[in-house]
A protein has these predicted regions:
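Cleavable N-terminal export/targeting peptides
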Residues: 1-28
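Short glycine/proline- and aromatic-enriched beta-strand/turn motifs that initiate or cap beta-hairpins
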Residues: 18-73
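Strand-connecting loop/turn motifs
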Residues: 31-35, 45, 57-63, 91-97, ...
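Transmembrane beta-strands of outer-membrane beta-barrel pores
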Residues: 40-46, 54, 68-74, 88-90, ...
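Membrane-embedded beta-strands of outer-membrane beta-barrel proteins
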Residues: 50-52, 82-86, 123-125, 177-179, ...
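Outer-membrane beta-barrel transmembrane domain signature
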Residues: 114-208, 219-221
Length: 221
């Protein structure tokens, strides 16, 4: 019972997929190295977020960035997610391109029973067609909590005296797959859409509504 409760607590904290900035490499100008994005959507609940990223020229185009997302609610500091990572376009042929994303993820989750801090990783790939004013493609990724620290409330310790605070290593993660599209507005702004499904590794902890939706507005400068 104690093990099952611990697994459930960690699953509650890390079940959301890793949202990230959409980038259309074809729409970026040489004098636009900075990107900011604001997004809103559904991610195991209604969420909002913002992020900043900067592009660099290497062998292939590279984007490094930081973003934060929070659920819509009264106590925004109780639950949040911070991602630090990068994207690189690995191939481009006549507008058809593939981009790889890698990020480290920190999550905080709190309720009346437990406070959880989780460190994890996210790996994804986006492949599709990009033109200077629009893009569309498919994405696939895997989001995994590497380790989580649980601090249980007094009520939990009263109900389950053997339960322990400390670090735990989850055994699973979450796959996500879906559509990624974008539309350039003028010389500076971009609209983006991400829509897809999520699936827990092992199919044993899937969400009641296993999907995600993200609408974003970005600016390049």
């Amino acid at each position: 019972m104690k093990t099952a409760i611990t697994i459930l607590m960690i699953t509650m904290a890390v079940s959301e997929f890793s949202a990230s900035q959409n980038v259309n490499w074809r729409s970026l100008r040489d004098d636009q190295n900075n990107l900011v994005q604001f997004n809103f959507g559904y991610d195991y609940g209604v969420t909002a977020g913002m992020g900043y990223a900067r592009t660099f020229s290497a062998i292939r185009p590279v984007l490094l960035g930081l973003d934060i997302s929070l659920p819509m609610g009264n106590n925004l500091s109780d639950d949040f997610k911070v991602r630090l990572g990068g994207q690189i376009e690995i191939v481009e042929i006549a507008g058809f391109a593939a981009t790889v994303r890698v990020a480290s993820v920190f999550r905080k989750y709190h309720n009346d029973f437990v406070n959880i801090a989780s460190f994890g990783s996210d790996f994804g790939i986006v492949a599709g067609y990009s033109a200077p004013t629009w893009s569309i493609g498919g994405e696939f990724g895997f989001d995994k909590a590497i380790t989580s620290h649980l601090k249980h409330a007094a009520i939990m310790k009263e109900m389950f005296p053997d339960i322990k605070d400390g670090w735990y290593v989850p055994t699973g993660g979450n796959y996500y797959y879906g559509l990624a599209a974008g539309k350039t507005l003028g010389e500076t702004y971009d609209l983006s859409l991400r829509l897809g499904a999520t699936r827990a590794q092992g199919n044993d902890e899937n969400a009641i509504l296993p999907m995600y939706l993200q609408l974003g507005l970005g600016a390049r400068f």
